Amino acid sequence: MSRIIPLITLILLALAGTVTANEREDDVAAEAAAADSDDAPEQDEASSSEAEEEDGADTVKPLELLGKTVQPGTFETLHWAPDQSFRSIATPVPVLVAHGNEPGPRLCLTAAVHGDELNGIEMVRRLMYELEPTELAGTVVGVPIVNLDGFRNGSRYLSDRRDLNRYFPGHEKGSAASRLAFSLFNNIVRQCDYLVDLHTGSQKRINQPQLRADLDKSEVVAFAKHFGGMTVLHSPPGDGMLRAAAVEEGIVAVTMEAGGPNRLEDEAVDYGVQALETLLENLDMRKASRFWGAPQPVFFESEWIRAGQGGILLSEVELNDQVRKGEILGTVTDPISNTGSAIIAPYDGRVLGMAVNQVVHAGFAAYRIGEEKSAEEVEAKAELSDQTLEDNGFKPEEPAAPKEEEEASDAPREEDPAPPADDTE
């Protein structure tokens, strides 16, 4: 009996050890399961975060412009208030905005920087109101009437006789023209990636629909190719022009010229709208509805041909005519003596701009003749120009801000600068 008791004791101890071991294994397993369950939410959160980031990459944010918020897929009419005269009775300038549902570039369209140039106003209206924001990738901002002052007066200029397109990017403490330019440029134009500034001829002149572009810049060359069959004229912008200020800021910009001032020309407007529609399609901002496959004439050189005497100008050519060297473009006749002289084409080319029939003085710029170049020649020249700048270590500098005292004073540049006869932009 004494032997049986120790044996039973040993058996009980062995069973107890087995139970303890099993409990320890169960505890370890439970701890592991708990650890796995703690990690699972983190993994789920990480996966969810990655998915949100992927979705966010294609999410279009609301557009903040002129103190307002424009939701994706909507069209809004905002108001820009540049009037510095009497704030209490200032008239805001309408700004049309189509903000797309899909990501894409921002395109700015400006018209009537010169108040008597009406064709661009109608181009902006037609294009903006045919856009469907729900089907648009990116944003189109249209300012149909920049120079509301000149528009009301039927004048190219502001009421103080200054040419607004000679004061960009402007200065907040400068003249009235400089302040207006500063407001437009900083509040609207600088918020965009591309700019098309719409103009017409001036001073009783009309222009074949065309782009004015600095073809020495490769990015401008690439942009100009997006307008379908519209003629392109190499034209580096002058100081103070909106196009010049935009390019300095890194905004790819061109000027579109079409028709003449103080008139609405349906054919010129249609041509311009077609070019802008083609631009949107080539920038992948909307699906192509039609393809403008016409070849794009490019003119790297152009010259205004002037009248040799005063008198009555009567043209024998029309816009876009191809002319040969020695061909008569028009005649100028003295209305009293009946003596006249012919205006002769100095080389082969195309009529890009011309004066309407009128009384002219000797030296009057009557016909702008363009000398055509191939697209390959233009691209090669632009690439060479860019490479030459890089080889010489050229790095564009930030444009210096106008000196406050110069802008605020009556310095010569603030006086009304008369536009050159051979430049209508």
Task: List the predicted regions and their residue ranges.
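Sec-dependent N-terminal signal peptides
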Residues: 1-23
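Structured catalytic-domain cores with a bias toward divalent-metal coordination
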Residues: 22-425
